Design a protein with these regions (language model features):
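Bacterial N-terminal signal peptides that target proteins for export
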Residues: 2-17
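C-terminal motif of bacterial Sec signal peptides marking the signal peptidase cleavage site
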Residues: 25-27
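N-terminal pre-domain segments of enzymes
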Residues: 43-110
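Short helix-loop boundary/capping segments
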Residues: 220-279
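N-terminal helix-cap/turn-to-beta initiation motif at the start of protein domains
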Residues: 110-126
């Protein structure tokens, strides 16, 4: 069992399948298991080719059976070309029919605001998701290419709240694994990430490195016509927030963010020590089969790691493609049952976080308290609700507020 798996098992969650599901989730930078049919290949060790001035590393001559072609790189050792990531097999899915773009609700919208809203609401639904990440540029003298990342999930995205100028979308993983005899497993469900969209948002909290977030105020001219996207972790703690704008031209509907900082994704957190901030621009693109989250990321050193240096220290660039494809089966309706049982608790968590963010110009998060991460305190409580314990709003409020007070620190 990996260290990540052990962490989630220690959370004491009622469903062991929930712990398993988390192993395959790179929270908010999503990710898990391979989608290709057949038994997954055993992972191969990464070779250490001699570095070159270009940073690409020495590779065998073309035609050698030990190399393979990798897009954007050319020929690389086969062990590097083989993706890392999850190794489980998902149950078969039925893809929904493709839709003609622009979507009718976008084409028929009376103004830009209505078109933007229609595009955001179109992100909801049931999906097969595939996660693809590959480093495309190395910037250090001793840089060597690393294996790309490829994983999968089946995910339900629901509209949690819609007040017109604000839309909240909640992601819930509903995973069906393939048993050895080819039959699908029982669904394995867990709360995943959340994305909040706010029109002309002038009050943002952006990631600053070192597990710290700070308020950024924007003027009216900067935010006119824009939408912010705020992304939250599985425990509803903040991850990153960025302004961006939707563009609708013919079949194209795309939201493009400003350049923004993000914490390391979970897929990198335990294996990379050479950088601590992901700086990038990302796009949300509607497609005939669903939508695409495209990322162009720079991996950089910041915060305490940078010491007293003011010049940016970049180590590599990465391309990310998270592809959301609509499905009609298997049914992911068990997500509805989960939210009926736990929704009131998570609403308290969101309100508590909103209060904390509103009163703080800057705050930081402790990584753990008494050996437990923040999500463990929340998921342990939620597990009791899933087991049938009656919901007590006052008790939940006390638990949430007390828990956050132990993890959040910084001036008010």
């Amino acid at each position: 069992m990996s260290a990540t798996a052990a962490t989630y098992v220690r959370a004491g969650l009622r469903h062991s399948v929930l712990a398993v599901a988390f192993v395959f989730v790179a929270a908010c930078e999503h990710g898990p298991a391979r989608v290709s049919p057949g038994a997954p290949p055993a992972p191969l060790p990464q070779p250490a080719p001699q570095s070159t001035a270009s940073g690409y590393g020495a590779v065998p001559q073309t035609g050698s059976p030990e190399i393979t072609y990798v897009f954007g790189w050319g020929d690389l050792p086969a062990a590097i070309a083989r993706p890392r990531g999850g190794t489980t097999q998902g149950a078969a899915v039925t893809l929904a029919p493709s839709r003609r773009l622009p979507l009718p609700e976008i084409a028929g919208a009376r103004d830009a605001f209505t078109r933007d809203r229609a595009a955001i609401l179109a992100l909801a639904g049931d999906y097969r998701v595939s996660f693809h990440f590959m480093e495309s540029v190395g910037l250090t003298e001793d840089y060597k290419p690393i294996r790309p990342y490829h994983s999968w999930a089946t995910e339900h995205v629901r509209v949690l709240e819609d007040t017109g100028r604000f839309i909240s979308l909640q992601h819930t993983l509903v995973m069906f694994f393939r048993n050895p005899d080819g039959t699908p497993s029982v669904p394995m469900l867990t709360k995943h990430w959340r994305q909040d969209w706010t029109f002309e948002d002038a009050d943002l909290h952006t990631f600053r490195g070192d597990a710290t977030w700070a308020r950024r105020r924007a003027d009216a001219g900067e935010v006119a016509g824009s939408w912010s996207q705020a992304v939250f972790q599985v425990d509803d703690s903040p991850r990153y927030e960025a302004l961006g704008r939707w563009e609708h031209r013919g079949a194209l509907s795309v939201w493009t963010s400003e350049r923004a900082w993000r914490p390391l994704p979970r897929r990198e957190h335990t294996m990379r020590k050479d950088y601590d901030v992901m700086e990038g621009v990302h796009r949300i693109i509607l497609t005939p089969t669903g939508w695409l989250h495209e990322q162009n990321n720079w991996k950089r050193v910041a915060g305490e790691r940078a010491g007293n240096r003011n010049d940016p220290q970049f180590v590599a660039a990465e391309i990310g493609l998270d592809r959301y494809e609509r499905i009609t089966s298997p049914s992911l309706e068990v997500a509805d049952d989960y939210w009926k049982k736990t929704g009131a608790y998570w609403a308290i968590v969101r309100r508590a976080w909103a209060d904390e963010i509103a009163k703080r110009e800057r705050f930081a998060l402790r990584s753990s308290v008494e050996g437990k991460q923040l999500f463990e305190f929340h998921f342990g409580y939620v597990d009791k609700l899933e087991s049938g314990q009656p919901f007590d709003a006052a008790d939940a409020e006390r638990h949430v507020r007390a828990t956050l007070s132990r993890f959040i620190h910084g001036p008010q």
